[in-house]
Amino acid sequence: MYDWLNALPKAELHLHLEGSLEPELLFALAERNKIALPWNDVETLRKAYAFNNLQEFLDLYYKGADVLRTSQDFYDLTWAYLLRCKEQNVIHTEPFFDPQTHTDRGIPFEVVLNGIAAALKDGEQQLGITSGLILSFLRHLSEAEAEKTLDQALPFRDAFVAVGLDSSEMGHPPSKFQRVFDRARHEGFLTVAHAGEEGPPEYIWEAIDLLKIQRIDHGVRAIEDERLMQRIIDEQIPLTVCPLSNTKLCVFDDMAQHNILDMLERGVKVTVNSDDPAYFGGYVTENFHALYTSLGMTQDQAKRLAQNSLDARLVKP
């Protein structure tokens, strides 16, 4: 079944480039940039990938991102991810990157973007993988800081298709970023947002009504609100669900409790994604395979999930 799932043409719509930084590449970049790491070797670092919640993961994620310093580093990071896409027949990807993670460390915005954009361009030309880049604001920072990031992005507007919202969800509702999202839409960007991962269904309502999103990233807690479920089904608002991430961060205690197939059967346009695959133990095919082994996902369900991902692209072929 793994090989069959791997061969299925699919799109990935919820992937943080910084979260695809495998320990081996992290150590190689640390050496290249002469950065001392708090871990002795790759295995010690991998053992640190045990999280009880979103915040514990984010603390490690930001520490790991510190090895990314030059455009070449960002190119290598993105290229390594694209090679995984090629292996798993991901024919289109819409990855996030978090500029504030890097600009707050003194890395110029264009250094980050140039490396990522060059790799995505090469990915299309050399690997046949199409893409659309999403600039994500960090929700634990202020809206004023998000505005500043949008200002930095505008000279490079052709490099992005959308803005998003990620990082620590609790206590940082989508409404906190309504003005900057209004402005981004006015500037011609599409919008997406993480909501309903650890946060309540109310955050999903806010993302839909205030941020006017095209897609909800995660959204698994929508099932707690029947009226919200009906709205998502009626309007066919896609959900970019990340099963391995959800179990690794204890959103669900184990995969057998995951609600993605329940949502699929109720008519929700759910998709399967890897989120931060280096940290959560699997890329897209591994996420599909986990649904097969733990939930008994059928081939028909897998085909529908893969088709949903292709249908929910912001960048249409």
Swiss-Prot record:
Catalytic center residues: E197
A GO cellular-component term linked to this record: cytosol
InterPro entries with a match to the protein in the record: A_deaminase_dom, ADE, Ado/ade_deaminase, Metal_Hydrolase
Marked site positions, Important for catalytic activity: H218
EC number: 3.5.4.2
One of the protein's GO biological processes: hypoxanthine salvage
Keyword vocabulary terms for this entry: Hydrolase, Metal-binding, Nucleotide metabolism, Zinc
Protein family membership: Belongs to the metallo-dependent hydrolases superfamily. Adenosine and AMP deaminases family. Adenine deaminase type 2 subfamily.
Protein name: Adenine deaminase
Organism for this UniProt entry: Pseudomonas fluorescens (strain SBW25)
